[in-house]
Design a protein with these regions (language model features):
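Short polar/charged helix/loop
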Residues: 1-140
């Protein structure tokens, strides 16, 4: 995918030597967090490796759960666990996939890269930003 290499280079990242690998048995179960771009991938991992199901999300799904939940947990791992509990109590939305740029022109790759930048920035904020004093103090 020369388009992906070009768009990454425009963002200062060299992926020219990157080689995709298949997910092997045990990889997802050993991970602290598995982020997928599509719900079908998340669902396949949950079926194939049930121990990983609570730590496997689409990128957009996890961001939504973290932002909507207002979690005051102190650590990223605790926030992820709370998001998994919220998912069990709620719904999975079909519109939480990231589009696959394969076959798109270069501008399509750029658009998806910009979308990923936004979602990843939101994820980092939701996982690592300090807890607002009003949430963490117990005061209402």
């Amino acid at each position: 995918m020369p388009e992906a290499v070009e768009v990454a280079a425009e963002r200062g990242v060299d992926i020219s030597g990157h080689v995709a690998t298949r997910l092997r048995p045990g990889m997802a179960s050993a991970a602290d967090l598995v982020l997928c771009m599509a719900g079908e991938h998340r669902d396949l991992i949950a079926r194939e490796e049930p121990p990983a199901a609570g730590r496997t999300f689409t990128l957009k799904e996890l961001v939504r759960l973290l932002e909507d939940g207002g979690h005051a947990e102190a650590t990223p791992a605790a926030r992820i666990a709370a998001a998994a509990r919220d998912r069990e109590a709620g719904t999975v939305r079909p519109d939480e996939d990231v589009a696959d740029p394969l076959g798109l022109p270069l501008d399509g790759y750029r658009a998806i890269a910009a979308e990923l930048d936004d979602w990843i920035a939101r994820l980092v904020s939701a996982l690592w930003d300090p807890i607002p004093a009003a949430l963490g103090s117990g005061d209402t």
